Regions:
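Cytosolic-facing loops and C-terminal tails of multi-pass membrane proteins
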Residues: 202
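Nucleotide and nucleotide-moiety/phosphate-recognizing core
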Residues: 2-134, 140-154, 159-178, 184-198
Length: 202
């Protein structure tokens, strides 16, 4: 199936487990996390933007389009996803969280293959042990259903995905590539590593 695809880096959360710090702007080897994400995405998709509800001018200074959630307050990643779908010109949007800088170069390829093969509107990552719904490829056509879902008070990503026929895609061969930097302790640990060869997918 021929489809147009854009990508969005999800950086709109409150980062409670990081003491409220803006995750995407935390430095890893001297570079903001979101720039690691952007670099890995750029080899897979041409049109990339960032969903951020804070520090938008800082993100925008990197030359990447930035947008906040249309819904007021912090409603979780689905709120940013809804706004992304509402503003998208592409048929599908690839979503990636801002705290996972090691994801594989074949992320889009495998998710798109699953969407094509199964004829579904959503495909997301499973690393063999855990589901990673914020790594997903989602059809713009779901924006109406997602708006209704959020208006009902629901916030659970996997529930929405399952209700809409999502398929999980096996990335167990690259499980370590979905390691996320969730806390300040995680950030300290990774900043102490000389390189990330043990995490970045081959």
């Amino acid at each position: 199936m021929t489809m147009s695809i854009s990508a969005v880096i999800l950086a709109g959360g409150q980062a409670k487990r990081m003491g409220g710090a803006d995750k995407g702007l935390q430095l890893l080897h001297g570079k903001p996390l979101f720039q690691f994400i952007y670099a890995r995405l750029h080899s897979q998709v041409e049109t990339i933007s960032i969903n951020a509800n804070r520090n938008q001018t800082i993100y925008a200074a990197a030359g990447v389009p930035v947008f906040g959630d249309n819904l007021e307050g912090f409603h979780g990643p689905l709120s940013g996803i809804l706004t992304a779908l509402e503003r998208a010109d592409s048929d599908f949007v690839l979503f990636v969280p801002c705290d996972s800088p090691f994801f594989p170069d074949n992320l889009l390829e495998k998710l798109k293959s699953a969407v094509d093969f199964h004829g579904v509107s959503i495909a997301y990552v499973h690393d063999g042990e855990r589901e990673h719904p914020t790594f997903c490829l989602m059809a713009r056509s779901l924006k109406g259903k997602l708006a209704t879902y959020l208006a009902s008070g629901e916030r659970r990503m996997l529930q929405f995905m399952r209700q809409n026929g999502a398929v999980s895609v096996d990335f167990s061969e690259n499980k370590q590539a979905f390691t996320n930097i969730n806390t300040l302790a995680d950030l300290t640990y990774f900043n102490q590593q000389k390189d990330f060869s043990g995490f970045i997918a081959k």
